[in-house]
Amino acid sequence: MKMSRLVAFSSSLLLGAVLALTGAATANAASSVQAVDYVALGDSYSSGVGSGSYDSASGDCKRSTKAYPNLWANANSPASFAFTACSGARTDDVTAGQLSPLNSSTDLVSISIGGNDAGFADVMTTCVLQSESTCLSRIATARSYVDTTLPGKLNSVYTAIRSRAPAARVVVLGYPRFYKLGGSCIAGLSETERSAINSASDYLNAATAKRAADHGFTFSDVAGRFTGHEICSGSAWLHSVNWLSIGESYHPTAAGQSGGYLPAFSSAA
């Protein structure tokens, strides 16, 4: 009986110690997250266009409360959070108008950029409204830009970020493939056009990932997380063309932000 009580007592002490250590580890992990100073930069895929619930104070930048930067900040309670991503932004816009919150204390930065520089909005407009041959020609022009001009643009903005935030972890997020090939769409673009658009997105992501790596940044690919949720999938996390709100066309829905972009960022942050 005495031995049983001793074993039970020892076990309770051990359990208490384990729980105390676990609690301490959890508290330390929470406090480390709370110490983060986070700045969210980029274009409409980071501002949250397409997910609704836009902050009226953000005006045409259309920063959504359902965008992944806000979702991450709400879940992790960083010490400070600055959200300057803006719809329509190009690399030069980031350099000129989004970097002021960055400083030597900044711990974490997120950014999606390059799609507008490469003219992907015009690509989609061309492909929707014009012939297949014109669509494919416009895609080829965008790919040429990604080859010849975009790398220098990305270098400039990445260098500016690192200069202002020398100690920050910088996570560069890519773009999803738009279409599920052989999917549920029975009208609209041809399979050839859809395949070429997907390939162009992959091409842009590869170029962006290379520039990010060259600067010591982390590239987080979202394409895999959108697999099964492309346009024509029957469970899309992306808007197709929306004639009533054209700016939301080909942007992630709220589900795309929470189910695609948020975990892609969280896993790399």
Q: What is each stretch, according to the model?
A:
Residues 1-30:
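Secretory targeting and sorting signals
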Residues 25-39, 93-111, 154-168, 265-269:
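Short amphipathic alpha-helices and their capping/turn segments at secondary-structure boundaries
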Residues 30-85:
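Serine-esterase "nucleophile elbow" of acetyl-processing enzymes
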Residues 37-42, 46-48, 80-85, 107-112, ...:
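Structural recognition of the beta-strand scaffold that forms the well-ordered cores
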Residues 49, 93-146:
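Oxyanion-hole/transition-state-stabilizing segment in secreted/luminal serine hydrolases
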Residues 51-54, 121-133, 184-187, 231-241:
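Short, flexible, mixed-charge acidic loops at enzyme active sites
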Residues 71-80, 152-169, 203-220:
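A structural motif corresponding to the C-terminal end of an alpha-helix
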Residues 176-269:
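Catalytic His-Asp segment of secreted/periplasmic serine-dependent ester chemistry enzymes
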